[in-house]
C-alpha cells in the first residue's frame, strides 16, 4: 500500500494498465478541451504505426505508463555531445518521461482526479496517442541542462530513426546549428513541435529566426499554454512579432505557426519520486506534447498528410480563435481543435473518368432505376460508401446513393391500377370486317408501375383498328399499350390480344409506350400471319417526372397455326433508347449519365391455346440483349446486358353467364440476368494518394418480381359493367422484400 506524499502536488499511487484502447472511453478533460473524442481516436487508430520522437531528458522505458516495447530500445539513444549519458537514453530527470506520457502514454489513469480546474474520472485516457511508438533522444542531463549542439543532434537522430513527429519541450533557440537541425529533420518528412517557453514574454524577445527553408517552416509549430478555461497561462510565452525568415520575400510570423494547448495541472508521472508517483505538471513543455500527439493522430488517420507535409497546416487552419479576432501576437492561431481537424476541410470533391474534379455538393440525381434493372441496389450500395477528398487530399466516405432513385411498391386500394380488361370496343361490320376503338383521358393519379407508364397520366389516349375480311389488320393509336396491337396483328384474335395486356412488361414493348403507335397484320398462305408494329414513348408529364427516356421500337412477328386451337408465334424487336438503358432513365449531363443511345434486340415466343370456345391459355417468354454503352463521369460504361421475362394467363369469357369474364395471370416482368456497370472510384495507397480505377458492379437485381392477378368483369344492365381486380406483386421492381397488393373495383355506365 502506498502512502500519499504531499510535496508540490506530488503523490504516489498505483495505476492500472489498459489491455487495449477501443470502444467508448472516458477522456481526461485536457484532452476533450482540444476536441479528442471516441470518433477521433478510432479514426486515427489511436496513433498506431507511427513514431514520436521525444528530444528531452530521456524516457524511462519500463515505466508502467508505457506498453512493453512502446519505447524503442533499438531506435532510442543518448544524443548528447557535450556530456556522457550515465544510463543511455533512460531518464534521470523525470521531465522527458512526463512529456512522452502526455503525448503517447499507453495506460489509463486508474483513479479519479480533481485539480487545477480539471476533473478526471477514474479509468480515463490521459494521453493523446496511446498506441504510438516512442523514440527517446536524450539531450539534457540529470539537471535538465544541455547545449544547442546537444538538442540539434537529438533532432537529427530522431529524424534518422524515422520519427514522424519530433517533440522538443526545451527552450527554443535560433542558433545556426538549431536551424540546420530543423531543416534536416523536416527534409526527412518529420514535423517538429516546439514548446513556446515559460518566461511570460514574446518568443526570443521578438528576434527573428533566419535560414529556415520554406518546407521547414510548413512543418514547424510552436505551442503556448492555456489553463482549463482557455485563458493564457501566466508563465506562457507569446509569439510576439518575430518572424521565421526564409529570404527577403518569404517570411512567416511566429504567430502564424503558433497554437495554444492545455499546459496547466496536466497529470503525468514523476519517475524521480517513485515508480508509481504522479504530479500535476505545468508549462509549455506539457502543451507541446498535446499538439505532437495530435499530429500523430492525424497522420495515422490520413497518411497523405505525412506524404504532403500538411498536418501542421491543417491544425492551424482548424484551430479555435482566442483573443483578438484572427491570428494575433498573444494566442497565434488559437486553441487546437481536433474535432474540427477530423472533419472535411473545404469542399469534398471527386474526379470523374474524364479527369475533371467535381464538388460532391454539386452532384444531383441523374439515374432513375426502373425496368429490368430494378433499383440497381448493388450500384446504390457502392455509391453509399463512395470516397471523396477534401482540400487537404484526405479521403472521406460520402453517401451518393441518392443519385439513383426508384419507385417503391406500396399497398394500394386504388381501383384497377393496371391495364386490366382494357380491351377496345369491337364493332362487326357487313362483309366480315371489324372496327375496334378505345379512348379515355387518364386522371392524375400516379400508381406504381414497373416501367413508369404513370408518367403519361392526364393525357388523352386512344386506339383504333380496322380488320378487313381477309384478315388484314391496320391499327394506330396514342398512349395505348403496343402489346395489344402487336398480338392482335400476330394472332388475329381479340381475346389473345386482350389477355396479353395483363402480361404487359414481360418484353421490350413496354419500354416504348405512351406515345404514338401503329401496327399491321397480314395473312399469309396456310393460315400463317406476319405482324409489324412500331411504338414510341410520349411526352412526359412535368408534374410527375422531370426526366424520362425517349424510346422507340420496331417489331416483326410471325405466327403459325398448328391446329384451330393452337397457334404459336415468334417476334423480333429492336429497341432504341435515348437517355435510357433497359427502362432506366439517366441524364447525359449528370455524373451518372451514359453516352449515346442504347440499342436492344429481343426475341419473344408466344403461344395461345383455346381450351374451348370460351377458355384460353396464353404463354409468353422473351429474351433480350442490350449493347454496351460508354460513359465518362462517375460511371465508365455499361457492359452488354441480357434479360428475360415470361407470363402465363388463363381466361374464361363466359364463366357464369354471357358477357362475364374471368382471368388469372402470373408474370415475371423483364429482368436482367447478366450485366454490369463500371463505377469510377478511388482507393488510397499506403502513402494516402488516391488511386482511381473502374470497379465492375453487377446490375442483376437482388429480387425477382412475380405478379399474380385475378380479374373479373360482368355486365350489370344495359351499358353498365362491373370490373373487379386483385393483384399481388412479390419483389416489386425486382427489389427483394418489397411486396404490395392492390384491390379495386370499377362500375361504369355508358350513355
Residue locations for each model-derived region?
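Extracellular S/T/G-rich loop segment that most often corresponds to the catalytic His/Ser-adjacent loop
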Residues: 56-59, 64, 212-296
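C-terminal subdomain of the subtilisin-like protease fold in secreted/lumenal serine endopeptidases
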Residues: 33-40, 156, 165-167, 222, ...
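Outer membrane beta-barrel translocator domains of Type V secretion systems
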Residues: 403-606
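Residues on the lipid-exposed face of transmembrane beta-strands in outer-membrane beta-barrel proteins
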Residues: 462-466, 518-522, 556-560, 605-609, ...
Amino acid at each position: 500500500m502506498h502512502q500519499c506524499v504531499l510535496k508540490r502536488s506530488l503523490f504516489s499511487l498505483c495505476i492500472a494498465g489498459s489491455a487495449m484502447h477501443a470502444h467508448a472511453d472516458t477522456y481526461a478533460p485536457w484532452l476533450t478541451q482540444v476536441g479528442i473524442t471516441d470518433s477521433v481516436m478510432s479514426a486515427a487508430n489511436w496513433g498506431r504505426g507511427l513514431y514520436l520522437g521525444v528530444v528531452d531528458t530521456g524516457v524511462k522505458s519500463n515505466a508502467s505508463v508505457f506498453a512493453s516495447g512502446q519505447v524503442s530500445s533499438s531506435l532510442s539513444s543518448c544524443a548528447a555531445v557535450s556530456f556522457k549519458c550515465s544510463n543511455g537514453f533512460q531518464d534521470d530527470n523525470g521531465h522527458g518521461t512526463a512529456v512522452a506520457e502526455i503525448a503517447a502514454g499507453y495506460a489509463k489513469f486508474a483513479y479519479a482526479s480533481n485539480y487545477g480546474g480539471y476533473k478526471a474520472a477514474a479509468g480515463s485516457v490521459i494521453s493523446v496517442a496511446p498506441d504510438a511508438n516512442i523514440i527517446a533522444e536524450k539531450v539534457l542531463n540529470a539537471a535538465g541542462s544541455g547545449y544547442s549542439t546537444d538538442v540539434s543532434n537529438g533532432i537529427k537522430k530522431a529524424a534518422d530513426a524515422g520519427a514522424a513527429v519530433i517533440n522538443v519541450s526545451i527552450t527554443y533557440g535560433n542558433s545556426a546549428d538549431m536551424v540546420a537541425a530543423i531543416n534536416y529533420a523536416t527534409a526527412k518528412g518529420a514535423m517538429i513541435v516546439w514548446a513556446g517557453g515559460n518566461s511570460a514574454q514574446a518568443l526570443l524577445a521578438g528576434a527573428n529566426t533566419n535560414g529556415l527553408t520554406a518546407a521547414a517552416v510548413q512543418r514547424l509549430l510552436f505551442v503556448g499554454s492555456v489553463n482549463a478555461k482557455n485563458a493564457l497561462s501566466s508563465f506562457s510565452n507569446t509569439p510576439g512579432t518575430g518572424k521565421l525568415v526564409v529570404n527577403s520575400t518569404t517570411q512567416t510570423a511566429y504567430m502564424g505557426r503558433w497554437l495554444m494547448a492545455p499546459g496547466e495541472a496536466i497529470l503525468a508521472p514523476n519517475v524521480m519520486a517513485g515508480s508509481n508517483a504522479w504530479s500535476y505538471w505545468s508549462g509549455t513543455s506539457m502543451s507541446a506534447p498535446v499538439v505532437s500527439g495530435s499530429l500523430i493522430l492525424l497522420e495515422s488517420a490520413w497518411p497523405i498528410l505525412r506524404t504532403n507535409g500538411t498536418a501542421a497546416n491543417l491544425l492551424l487552419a482548424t484551430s479555435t480563435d482566442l483573443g483578438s479576432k484572427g491570428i494575433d501576437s498573444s494566442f497565434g492561431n488559437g486553441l487546437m481543435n481536433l474535432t474540427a481537424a477530423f472533419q472535411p476541410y473545404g469542399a469534398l470533391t471527386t474526379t470523374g473518368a474524364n479527369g475533371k474534379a467535381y464538388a460532391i455538393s454539386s452532384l444531383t440525381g441523374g439515374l432513375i432505376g426502373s425496368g429490368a434493372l430494378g433499383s440497381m441496389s448493388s450500384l446504390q450500395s457502392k455509391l453509399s460508401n463512395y470516397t471523396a477528398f477534401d482540400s487537404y487530399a484526405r479521403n472521406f466516405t460520402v453517401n451518393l446513393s441518392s443519385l439513383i432513385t426508384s419507385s417503391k411498391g406500396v399497398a394500394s386500394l386504388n381501383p384497377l391500377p393496371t391495364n386490366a380488361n382494357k380491351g377496345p370496343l369491337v364493332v362487326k361490320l357487313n362483309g366480315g370486317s371489324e372496327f375496334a376503338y378505345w379512348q379515355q383521358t387518364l386522371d392524375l393519379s400516379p400508381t406504381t408501375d414497373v416501367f413508369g407508364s404513370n408518367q403519361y397520366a392526364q393525357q388523352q389516349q386512344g386506339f383504333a383498328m380496322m380488320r378487313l375480311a381477309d384478315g388484314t389488320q391496320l391499327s394506330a393509336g396514342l398512349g395505348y399499350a403496343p402489346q395489344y396491337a402487336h398480338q392482335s396483328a400476330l394472332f388475329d384474335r381479340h381475346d389473345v390480344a386482350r389477355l396479353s395486356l395483363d402480361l404487359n412488361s414481360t418484353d421490350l414493348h413496354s419500354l416504348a409506350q405512351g406515345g404514338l403507335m401503329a401496327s399491321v397484320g397480314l395473312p399469309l398462305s396456310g393460315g400463317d400471319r406476319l405482324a409489324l408494329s412500331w411504338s414510341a414513348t410520349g411526352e412526359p408529364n412535368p408534374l410527375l417526372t422531370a426526366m424520362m427516356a425517349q424510346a422507340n421500337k420496331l417489331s416483326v412477328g410471325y405466327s403459325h397455326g398448328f391446329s384451330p386451337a393452337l397457334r404459336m408465334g415468334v417476334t423480333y424487336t429492336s429497341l432504341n433508347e435515348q437517355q435510357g438503358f433497359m427502362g432506366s432513365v439517366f441524364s447525359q449531363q449528370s455524373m451518372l449519365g451514359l453516352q449515346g443511345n442504347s440499342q436492344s434486340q429481343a426475341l419473344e415466343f408466344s403461344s395461345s391455346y383455346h381450351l374451348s370456345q370460351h377458355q384460353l391459355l396464353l404463354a409468353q417468354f422473351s429474351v433480350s440483349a442490350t449493347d454496351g454503352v460508354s460513359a465518362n463521369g462517375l460511371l465508365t460504361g455499361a457492359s452488354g446486358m441480357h434479360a428475360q421475362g415470361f407470363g402465363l394467363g388463363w381466361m374464361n369469357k363466359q364463366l357464369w353467364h354471357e358477357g362475364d369474364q374471368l382471368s388469372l395471370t402470373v408474370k415475371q416482368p423483364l429482368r436482367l440476368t447478366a450485366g454490369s456497370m463500371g463505377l469510377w472510384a478511388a482507393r488510397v495507397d499506403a502513402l494516402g494518394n488516391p488511386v482511381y480505377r473502374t470497379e465492375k458492379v453487377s446490375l442483376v437485381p437482388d429480387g425477382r418480381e412475380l405478379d399474380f392477378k385475378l380479374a373479373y368483369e360482368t355486365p350489370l344492365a344495359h351499358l353498365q359493367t362491373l370490373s373487379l381486380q386483385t393483384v399481388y406483386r412479390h419483389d416489386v421492381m425486382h427489389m427483394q422484400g418489397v411486396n404490395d397488393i392492390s384491390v379495386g373495383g370499377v362500375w361504369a355506365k355508358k350513355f
